[in-house]
Amino acid sequence: MQKWWFTHNNRSIRRKSTIKMRIVLAALVLIIAPALLWGLIDIYRSANGRPCASFEEIKQKYAVSDAALLDRNGEVIHTLRVDVHGRRLDWTNLGQVSPSMVRATLRVEDKRFYSHGGIDWLALVSATFSNLTHKNLRGASTITMQLTSILDRKLRPRNGSRRGILQKWNQLKAAVSLDNHWTKDQILEAYLNLITYRGELSGICAASRGLFNKEPSGLEEAESLILASLITSPNASVEEVAKRACRFASPVSRNSIRDMAYKTLGRPYHIRRDASIAPHVARLLLTNGKKESKCTLDGNLQRYVHASLNEAVRFLENQNVSDGTALVVENKTGDILAYVGNSGTSPTTLYVDGITAYRQAGSTLKPFLYELALEKKLLTPSSILEDSPLEIVTPTGLYVPHNYDNIFRGPVSVRTALSSSMNIPAVRVLGLVGVTDFVERLQELGFKGISQAPEFYGYSIALGSADITLYELVNAYRTLANNGRFSNMRLVFDGNRHHAQNILDKKAAFLISHILSDRQARSTTFGLENHLSTRFWTAVKTGTSKDMRDNWCVGYSDTYTVGVWIGNFSGEPMRNVTGITGAAPVWLGIMNYLHRGFTSKPPQPPGGVQSAQLTFEDSIEPPRTEWFIAGTEPAGMVLVNRVHAKPRITYPTQETLIAIDPEIPQHLQRVPFRFEPQSRRFTWTLNKEKIGTNDSVYLWTPKQGVHELAITDEDGHILDSVTFLVR
């Protein structure tokens, strides 16, 4: 009896509990059902509401992280990273994504994407039940829902936590609205372009190129599964990504997918830039948030110049050459057509812009010195200069210039001296022109680095002791090509022509161009066959700075000016490299490339310039037809001493102190007495006693004491005298 009573009582209790549970559930249904119904109505009512933006607006607002530099023809010649917060490449249309990538994305993220209306209710209910029972925590966000949180910042989780109920609710509403206004393909295309795959790689193009070095259209199944498996957790470990990818792969491909995941994700990503030939111009122009900028460069020419420079520097590596730069400009417009600031051969100097770096000018400034002398009518192309030993007393000591080859050629014409780049005649010309006037002229030509007082440079500026840039030098030579008219060069089409002003006399500029184009005149130093000789008209000058640290070649045709520098950005000297062997071959190659379809014609003589037939005294140079500024042409034969200064003793100078070397027997020591010009007949006297006649250099055995040295002419008149001390 007792057992029956307990059994009956338990059944009664269970029945009552079941009834209560049903009542509670019924109550919950009665309470929740209207709420759910209201919620569903609210969600689908939002379908008529406009989403945060249209597909076209999102695509238009999309910004790549790399800005593009376009050449004059619209070709992308360089891309430059301008956004450091994410790596985004070009927007990829859905049709440009491989089918395997589309399938993998849908399989991993949203297998019923094309059948639901923005919300996968089946997945949502299943995920809710799993989360409530704690069996398997998972999400149920569709591709559409994920996209809404990308498009609307308010729908994203805050501070790394999960979304709140209200935020999730708004996401559901936004997904339905988006699905109602966008096509499925538009949603999927935007999703693939906006999601983050790995680290800073955002969008399918950056992920595909960064991880697999291929365009999205070329992605294969294994690569696609790895990328799709990154979406849920972009920064997950390689092991987690590989495990997730294998879960969606066929059994036979899992090992290869795992190996690929470890190989691909276990190394830093790298995006290869096909367009990377103008880095220095890109850094100049792609500023202030610009995503695109068109410049004056010619892409094909830029590639050729860079390749030529790179090849030349590598060829000279054994002569301690590491770097090179080149600049090409159109004479008439000032458009810069090629700007190669670095040959790219030295990894330690890849970011150095050698075009704007200051280097010693060498002989490249001589044409402007001679132009000023011609302009002032102090000289003509046929004037005779003495190429002989020279010593100049300066406030800082004795200045003794030398020719590059240490050969003295005696009397030479201005044409020969400039074309053959003789140093001592150039210093003599500077003595005629004046250091101050020459420095001021260089400043007028845009040499901003020449900013010190004239006395800072002294006579050495004639031989290029001043620091200049290739940019400044090319524009100065372009001024010669434009008959003396100076204007700024340009890298962008700004719509305005830069104002031109007359800096050089057009008649003198014509004479300089004629001299620099004279193959015969330059043969004295360089020979007839060299890298300065072109099959069309060009005017060109080389330069080499002290200790072979800088190597220049700058010249122009009727259309283009080209400048090349070879050397070391570190300042180390080269070994046995001159302008004719270093920079000139590159210059010649560029000129030939520029004129492969047409020729270059010599400039027409301007008004006020005329030619005349002339001969030289003692036949120091062959007879020729020479050009002159009207009124400066010689009457008949050119005399050797036409432009000589007053005869003088060049060594020792006044009050020179000479010390006898105690280590060397006195009778073996010699002091050279020097005099110029050498063409005169004269007599050496020391302490009023005759010691020699017509010796350009007299070697004297020194004796202690104060001595008076003089030179006298045939009539005994003192031409020059100095007092010096020996101790």
Language model segments and positions:
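Soluble, non-transmembrane domains of envelope/secretory-pathway proteins that act on or interact
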Residues: 2-4, 8, 13, 28-38, ...
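Non-catalytic, structured segments within soluble enzyme domains
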Residues: 35-39, 136-306, 440-454, 459-464, ...
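Beta-lactamase-like hydrolase cores
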Residues: 43-64, 220, 299-330, 415-418, ...
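A short, well-structured edge-of-sheet supersecondary motif
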Residues: 66-80, 97, 319-348, 440-445
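Short, well-structured active-site flanking segments
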Residues: 114-124, 202-205, 351, 374-394, ...
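Conserved catalytic neighborhood of penicillin-recognizing serine enzymes
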Residues: 130-158, 269-271, 276-284, 332, ...
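Active-site loop and adjoining helix of the penicillin-binding protein/serine DD-peptidase-beta-lactamase fold
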Residues: 175, 231-249, 289-301, 346-391, ...
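A penicillin-recognizing enzyme superfamily signal
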Residues: 295-318, 327-330, 339-342, 346-360, ...
